[in-house]
Structures are given as structure tokens and as C-alpha cells.
């Protein structure tokens, strides 16, 4: 992650041994502690170091932060590290490039040290009809609808202690993509309660698919069943299950957004049957790019594989042809 790179962590270091902030991945600071336009640098950029109360950089400047700081009795925030209360950055400085597609290109165009072009989403965008029309990366990926230039919602930028800030333009920060999480749900999405409750190594030992922490499992534990040391306490297993319930809700929310961006990015025309007789069946379907912002698929060179799952059934519902099908794990 950019944080890990700034901390000097080795590329080959296990995530289990990285700094906790590095393991969080792409968080607020990766974009909002940048004060320089790097252009295409393959993500090799320097973050402005500082604690929680240090200034951040954004498109709007300090008006919103100042309004909160001017009402300490209402928002109960503090800007000193040692002062008790809700800590907040003491200033938001204007950084206009963060609104541009070039800012996204700092990371989303990757050339390896040997010159191999690993990812070129930004280069594709620069040559696209969307770029010619002035549509930015942010317009499609931070607007109302995932993957479409759909305008922006309005509302409070933050809710501090149940008190909303002033209404303003809202940019969506979910950044959905086609990625499918395969990490243990106790580890991802990042959850502060989960991180404080158990280490990553311990979470990897929690067999949530077997039902640990549910009444169905706990009331019928087989004789001689052995738990790893971190999970020998039934209370810990139930507490872990409560955390995972929150995680599964977040994963389901992310899934809906992921499918939204995929459905807007890929369009399937109607199936055209070229032949259907005793000699066989032949058909075709056109897959189209639903966006004019970049290629589909885009992303990393090694991941640019797309196939269709095709199932043909007879009149009785029996499967007579199957292609591109997945196993029980969805692979």
C-alpha cells in the first residue's frame, strides 16, 4: 500500500507483519495527505506525514472545518493531540488537483521498473470519448450511480456526535470495482473492533463457515472437538460472531455496489440463435462496453480475462450444455 511504501516496508513482507496503518490499504490519508501533483508515477508518491490533528488537503478548502471548529460546544472537537475530546484535523487546505483525473492517474497507470506496462486505466481514459467530453474519473466513480456520470448528491460531509455538518456537494468514496474479497471476514473489511479483539493470525483460525459462535454449532459441539488456543473461550467465539455479522452486512453492501458498476460497464445484447436442429445448436451474444471512459476489461494486464457463464437447458429444464461454470467457491 502507499502507506507501507512510505514506511519503507518491503514489497515481499507478509501483511500479517506490516504496520496496522499499512494493512488498512487505501484510506483517507492516501489521497488527503497529498499536496503535490505527481502525474503518472505508478503510485510512487510521498504522503505528507502528520498525526490525526495535522492539516489535510481537499478540493473545498477550510470553510467546512472552520465551521465545525467555531462551534466547539456543538461538535465537541479538539485539535490538540493531548487534549481530551474528538480529535479532528486543524485545517483543510485547498488542493485543486484532487478534483482532476490526472490525480487518479498517479496510481492508476502502473509501469514496472523493467518498463512493463502493468496497468493503463488512465492512459485509456486520456484517449477516450469521455475525456474528450470533459467527463472525469470522479464523475463516474464518485457520483450518485456507480460507473455512470450521474451528478452528485448533496448532504452533510460528516455527522459528528449525531450532529450533521452543513449541506454541501457529496462525492461518494466507496470506489467500487469488480474485485471480489477472498480474505477472512474477520480481517476484511477493516474493522477497528475486530483488530482490537484478535490479531490477524488469530482471525485466520476462526472457522466461521463451520458455524463457530452460533447456537446451532455451540449446542452440538462434537465430542473431542479441539479449538485453537485463541478460540477456546465460547464467549470469544460468540463475540467474534457478532463482529462478523457487521462484516457480512458491509460485504453485502459492497457486493451490490460492485454489481452496479459491472452492469453499467458491461452490456449484453440478446442471444442470437444461428442454428437449432438435430445437427446441433449454435448461438452468439455480443458483449459491449457500456462506458466510454476506458476499456472493459481494464485494470492489471494479468487480470484482463472475461468469460461468460453459459447454460443451455432443454424443455424439461435439464442442463445439456455448460460453459464457463464455477465451482462451489465461485471460482
Enumerate the predicted regions with their spans.
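Conserved, well-structured interaction surfaces
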Residues: 2-10
Amino acid at each position: 500500500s502507499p502507506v507501507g511504501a512510505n514506511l519503507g516496508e518491503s514489497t515481499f513482507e507478509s501483511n500479517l507483519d506490516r504496520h496496522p496503518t499499512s494493512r488498512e490499504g487505501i484510506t483517507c490519508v492516501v489521497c488527503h495527505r497529498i499536496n503535490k501533483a505527481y502525474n503518472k508515477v505508478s503510485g510512487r508518491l510521498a504522503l505528507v506525514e502528520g498525526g490525526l490533528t495535522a492539516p489535510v488537503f481537499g478540493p473545498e478548502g477550510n470553510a467546512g472545518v472552520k465551521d465545525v471548529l467555531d462551534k466547539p460546544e456543538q461538535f465537541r472537537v479538539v485539535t490538540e493531540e493531548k487534549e481530551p475530546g474528538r480529535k479532528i484535523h486543524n485545517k483543510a487546505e485547498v488542493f485543486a488537483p484532487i478534483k482532476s483525473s490526472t490525480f487518479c492517474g498517479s496510481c492508476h497507470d502502473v509501469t514496472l521498473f523493467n518498463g512493463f506496462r502493468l496497468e493503463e486505466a488512465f492512459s485509456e481514459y486520456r484517449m477516450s470519448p469521455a475525456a474528450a467530453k470533459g467527463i472525469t474519473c470522479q464523475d463516474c466513480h464518485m457520483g450518485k450511480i456507480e460507473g455512470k456520470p450521474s451528478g452528485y448528491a448533496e448532504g452533510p460531509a460528516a455527522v459528528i456526535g449525531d450532529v450533521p455538518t452543513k449541506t454541501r456537494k457529496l462525492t461518494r468514496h466507496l470506489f467500487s470495482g469488480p474485485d471480489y474479497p477472498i480474505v477472512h471476514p474477520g480481517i476484511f473489511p477493516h474493522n477497528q473492533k475486530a483488530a482490537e479483539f484478535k490479531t490477524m493470525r488469530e482471525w485466520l483460525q476462526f472457522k466461521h463457515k463451520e458455524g463457530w459462535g452460533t447456537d446451532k454449532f455451540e449446542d452440538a459441539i462434537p465430542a473431542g472437538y479441539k479449538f485453537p488456543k485463541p478460540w477456546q473461550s465460547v464467549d470469544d467465539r460468540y463475540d467474534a460472531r457478532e463482529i462478523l455479522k457487521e462484516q457480512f452486512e458491509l460485504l453485502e453492501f459492497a457486493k451490490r455496489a460492485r454489481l452496479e458498476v459491472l452492469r453499467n460497464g458491461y452490456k449484453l445484447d440478446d442471444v442470437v440463435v444461428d442454428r437449432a436442429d438435430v445437427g446441433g445448436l449454435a448461438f452468439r451474444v455480443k458483449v459491449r462496453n457500456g462506458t466510454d471512459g476506458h476499456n472493459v476489461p481494464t485494470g492489471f494486464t494479468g487480470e484482463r480475462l472475461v468469460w461468460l457463464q453459459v447454460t443451455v437447458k432443454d424443455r424439461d429444464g435439464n442442463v445439456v450444455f455448460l460453459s464457463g461454470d464455477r465451482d462451489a467457491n465461485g471460482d
